[in-house]
């Protein structure tokens, strides 16, 4: 169901019960509760981008939802990700996230694709992504990251692609990339890398991989 750009300030109450894909981008959904989607038991993909969204209240069980797009909104904090057991893709790009809590994604352990680019993240707790054993793609590009904890990627056994471009990173801690883990792609461009002995680990890792 395509409700893009309809100047909506609330979710339409008369959506077909068998809706699988719901496009609600470019509306005026400033504050929203996932309770609004409870009648849509088969809902798999939900696009809420470009709404000026400042608050998303979760908790209602949406058992089939696999993809949630929250990009280009005004979220200052990551919503609690409750009631989304099947979620595999989450996009919160181009919001105003300044921090992530440890274990922020423990309730969505099937997540495979996490897009956090274009926020205001300056640092991350080492447990930011704990529990995401199925995660394949992690995009942290175009934030304000100045340093990253050594253990950030530990436990992300399936991670294939990592974007760190466009941050303020000058170095990475020794052992940052898990020993023996093979990545398909790692993007490190557009950072002010400080070329001294502290960067020896990163240089060696690049040459080996």
Task: Say what each PLM segment does.
Residues 136-137, 142, 146-150, 156-209:
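Leucine-rich repeat domain C-terminal region
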Residues 13-16, 36-37, 58-62, 81-84, ...:
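Hydrophobic anchor residues at the C-terminal helix/turn of individual leucine-rich repeat
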Residues 6, 24-27, 48-51, 70-73, ...:
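Consensus "Asn ladder" position of solenoid repeat domains
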Residues 22, 43-48, 68, 87-92, ...:
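Hydrophobic packing within well-folded, soluble alpha/beta domains
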Residues 1-26, 30-50, 55, 65-71, ...:
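The feature captures the LRR N-terminal capping module
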Residues 9, 30, 54, 76, ...:
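Leucine-rich repeat
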């Amino acid at each position: 169901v395509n409700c893009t750009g309809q100047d909506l300030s609330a979710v339409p109450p008369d959506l077909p019960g068998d809706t699988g894909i719901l496009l609600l981008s470019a509306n005026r959904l400033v504050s929203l509760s996932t309770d609004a989607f409870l009648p849509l038991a088969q809902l798999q993909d939900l696009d809420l981008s470009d709404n000026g969204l400042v608050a998303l209240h979760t908790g209602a069980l949406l058992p089939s939802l696999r993809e949630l797009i929250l990009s280009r909104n005004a979220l200052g904090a990551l919503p609690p990700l409750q009631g989304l057991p099947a979620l595999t893709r989450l996009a919160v790009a181009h919001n105003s996230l300044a921090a992530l809590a440890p274990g922020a994604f423990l309730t969505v352990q099937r997540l495979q694709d996490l897009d956090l680019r274009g926020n205001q993240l300056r640092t991350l707790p080492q447990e930011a992504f704990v529990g995401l054993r199925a995660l394949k793609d992690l995009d942290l590009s175009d934030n304000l990251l100045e340093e990253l904890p050594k253990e950030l990627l530990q436990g992300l056994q399936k991670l294939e692609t990592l974007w760190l471009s466009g941050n303020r990173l000058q170095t990475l801690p020794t052992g940052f990339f898990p020993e023996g883990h093979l990545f398909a792609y790692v993007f490190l461009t557009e950072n002010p890398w400080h070329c001294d002995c502290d960067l020896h680990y990163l240089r060696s890792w690049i040459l080996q991989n």
